[in-house]
């Protein structure tokens, strides 16, 4: 049996599943001291520290001179990528851009009768640093993550975007990654990975300018580094391992449910794939399908461990309990494979993204549909949202008071200030009252 099967009669039995998942949230305390040393080294030594770490972990012959990718390298990479792949990347980028254009916020102003103008000014940050994992040996870079991070920044109006990705052992970056950057018009690309890339973004080096926002996925070293520099710079989120929860009734196809569960389980041994269903027969059929599909899956070892440790098939008496369990989990990806998925959508309050209906598999959203795939994990969808255009914007309040407004409210403001013991505040407000 690839994963445990649980039967929950009510939401009150949630701990049977919640306790199982709790272990995924435990931090690795051994990582933080290592990352702290990396941050300090890059802050002190800059490019040389980046080169030292890259020599140690990625490319044995790396030097500071290789940090920045040249335009000639990008041109060669683009020429080497099949035209069909270029077309697919362009289409995905167009879909993502179209969706995020709808997210754009605009500055707004309200004028009062006395002439006072109040408003909110929306401004993009100046610089963004985007991290793109290189994948296995640098040969499976997360192209989709580059698109999902860069396009919202561009739509927001960020004019300076730097991309960092670890090089392959020969010092090159994957041509498809460089082609994707070229399609997006990004020219500032550095060869650096892990926590030292995050450090370069946060502190800057001799040749890399510090940024205002750091975004992009990564392993525990990247995530820990982002957490430790947060406050000096903004970050997109603290993301954990991938996860999916599927709500399914008798109309769901077992082979599709199993395929969707495995789409997340193959990511990482810590990934979580959960089916919640009202149908015991579906639970049994999906379990059998998981075994059948695992037999031919290239990353079966990873998927098996993820399912064994963090996967579950949960049988519940009705969809009310199923929805309650889903809201408790607050998963990164929530698929609804039921006869009437839209009827449940309003009750599903906590999820990074909702995938409604049998033709909305999670990978469609991950790669191509348009909504962002950088999503809250580990239950944080209870209070946080997907990466968006807003990740790269800030909002500034505007107060342009008229003389009449200032004079009319001077005494009230002064009184509030004195209640807080702030006499200088009170005098500042009162000084605008010409009646005194």
UniProtKB/Swiss-Prot annotation:
Zn(2+) binds at residues 264, 267, 366, 425. One of its GO terms (molecular function) is zinc ion binding. Its cofactor is Zn(2+). Keywords: Amino-acid biosynthesis, Histidine biosynthesis, Metal-binding, NAD, Oxidoreductase, Zinc. It is an enzyme of class 1 (oxidoreductase). It comes from the Bacteria. Its EC number is 1.1.1.23. Pathway: Amino-acid biosynthesis; L-histidine biosynthesis; L-histidine from 5-phospho-alpha-D-ribose 1-diphosphate: step 9/9. Substrate binds at residues 242, 264, 267, 333, 366, 420, 425. It catalyses: L-histidinol + 2 NAD(+) + H2O = L-histidine + 2 NADH + 3 H(+). The active site is at residues 332-333. It holds the Pfam family Histidinol_dh. One of its GO terms (cellular component) is cytosol. GO terms for biological process: L-histidine biosynthetic process. Binds 1 zinc ion per subunit. Belongs to the histidinol dehydrogenase family. Catalyzes the sequential NAD-dependent oxidations of L-histidinol to L-histidinaldehyde and then to L-histidine. This is Histidinol dehydrogenase.
């Amino acid at each position: 049996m690839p994963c445990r099967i649980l039967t929950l009669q009510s939401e009150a039995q949630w701990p049977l599943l919640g306790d199982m998942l709790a272990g995924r949230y435990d931090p690795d305390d051994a990582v933080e001291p290592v990352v702290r040393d990396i941050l300090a080294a890059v802050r002190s030594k800059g490019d040389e520290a980046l080169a030292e770490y890259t020599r140690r972990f990625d490319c044995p012959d790396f030097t500071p001179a290789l940090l920045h990718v040249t335009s000639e390298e990008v041109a060669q990479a683009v020429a080497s990528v099949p035209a069909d792949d270029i077309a697919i990347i362009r289409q995905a980028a167009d879909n993502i851009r179209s969706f995020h254009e709808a997210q754009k916020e605009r500055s707004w102003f309200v004028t009062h009768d006395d002439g006072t103008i109040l408003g909110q000014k929306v401004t993009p940050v100046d610089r963004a640093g985007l991290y793109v994992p290189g994948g296995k040996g640098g040969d499976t870079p997360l192209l989709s993550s580059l698109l999902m991070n860069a396009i919202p920044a561009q739509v927001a109006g960020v004019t300076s975007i730097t991309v960092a990705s670890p090089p392959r052992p020969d010092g090159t970056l994957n041509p498809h990654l460089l082609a994707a950057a070229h399609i997006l018009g990004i020219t500032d690309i550095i060869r650096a990975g892990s926590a030292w890339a995050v450090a370069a973004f946060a502190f800057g080096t001799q040749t890399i300018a510090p940024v205002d926002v750091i975004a992009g996925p990564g392993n525990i070293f990247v995530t820990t580094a982002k957490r430790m520099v947060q406050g000096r710079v903004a970050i997109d989120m603290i993301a954990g391992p991938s996860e999916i929860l599927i709500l399914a009734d008798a109309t769901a196809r077992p082979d599709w449910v199993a395929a969707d569960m495995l789409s997340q389980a193959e990511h990482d041994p810590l990934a979580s794939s959960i089916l919640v269903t009202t149908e015991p027969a579906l639970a049994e059929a999906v379990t059998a399908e998981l075994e059948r599909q695992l037999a031919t899956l290239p990353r079966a070892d990873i998927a098996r461990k993820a399912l064994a440790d963090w996967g579950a098939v949960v049988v519940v008496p009705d969809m009310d309990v199923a929805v309650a369990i889903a809201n408790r989990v607050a998963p990164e990806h929530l698929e609804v494979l039921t006869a009437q998925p839209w009827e449940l959508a309003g009750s599903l309050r906590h999820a990074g993204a909702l995938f409604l209906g049998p033709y909305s598999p999670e990978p469609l959203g991950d790669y191509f549909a348009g909504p962002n795939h950088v999503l809250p994990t580990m239950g944080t969808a209870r209070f946080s949202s997907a990466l968006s255009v807003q990740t790269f914007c800030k909002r500034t309040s505007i107060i342009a008071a008229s003389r009449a407004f200032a004079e009319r409210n001077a005494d009230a403001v002064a009184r509030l200030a004195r209640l807080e013991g702030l006499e200088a505040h009170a005098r500042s407000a009162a000084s605008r009252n010409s009646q005194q």
